[in-house]
């Protein structure tokens, strides 16, 4: 398979073995990374490999592995707390759409008052783009395309509702 790069508001880095570049890519945005994943045991070796790539590039990593399918406000809050405690200046979403959605919600919630739910689709006030932590997305599945959009879908279990964070 040929390698290629494509840029349209999101840069796409694609090709066999390109995960080795993750550390240098993340380092462009910060030195303290919160890696956001599901807790899946079979994926632990991949998570460790990516952590090693990041630390090899001089990036300090905290691993939030509390993502569930259809991430909830509670997921976002727990991840945002970990990001704040770690002093994260960049978020890495690693996995499928749920990890990506959680990473983007965490990037907002860690830097804004209230919860990610407070910043839903065209709800005021909108998140301040200059405060939102940068998100690097590494997709391990095909599906929603969450890795190339700014949209994050989260679930509010108390209201039994699911909506998009998109502003």
Residue locations for each model-derived region?
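Glycine/serine-rich anion-binding loops at beta->alpha junctions
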Residues: 88-106, 140-146
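ATP/NTP phosphate-donor binding region
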Residues: 1-90
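A glycine/threonine-rich phosphate-anchoring loop and its flanking beta-alpha core
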Residues: 20, 111-167
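Fold-independent oxyanion-binding glycine-rich loops
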Residues: 16-17, 37-39, 67, 94-96, ...
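N-terminal loops that bind phosphate or other acidic moieties
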Residues: 85, 106, 123
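Short Gly/Thr/Asp-enriched flexible loops that form oxyanion-binding sites at enzyme active sites
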Residues: 50, 78-80, 99-112, 148-151
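Low-complexity, flexible helical/coil segments
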Residues: 50, 69-75, 95-101, 126-132
């Amino acid at each position: 398979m040929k390698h290629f790069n494509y840029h349209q508001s999101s840069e796409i880095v694609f090709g066999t073995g390109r995960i080795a570049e993750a550390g240098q890519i993340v380092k462009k945005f910060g030195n303290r990374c919160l890696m956001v994943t599901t807790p899946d045991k079979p994926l632990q070796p991949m998570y460790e490999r990516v952590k090693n790539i990041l630390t090899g590039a001089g990036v300090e990593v905290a691993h939030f592995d509390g993502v569930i399918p259809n991430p909830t406000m509670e997921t976002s809050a727990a991840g945002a707390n970990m990001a704040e405690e770690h002093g994260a200046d960049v978020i890495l979403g690693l996995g499928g759409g749920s990890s990506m959605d959680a990473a983007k919600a965490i990037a907002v919630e860690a830097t804004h008052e209230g919860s990610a739910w407070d910043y839903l689709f065209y709800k005021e006030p909108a998140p301040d783009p200059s405060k939102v932590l940068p998100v690097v997305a590494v997709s391990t599945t095909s599906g929603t395309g969450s890795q190339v959009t700014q949209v994050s879908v989260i679930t509010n279990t108390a209201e039994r509702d699911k909506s998009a964070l998109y502003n």
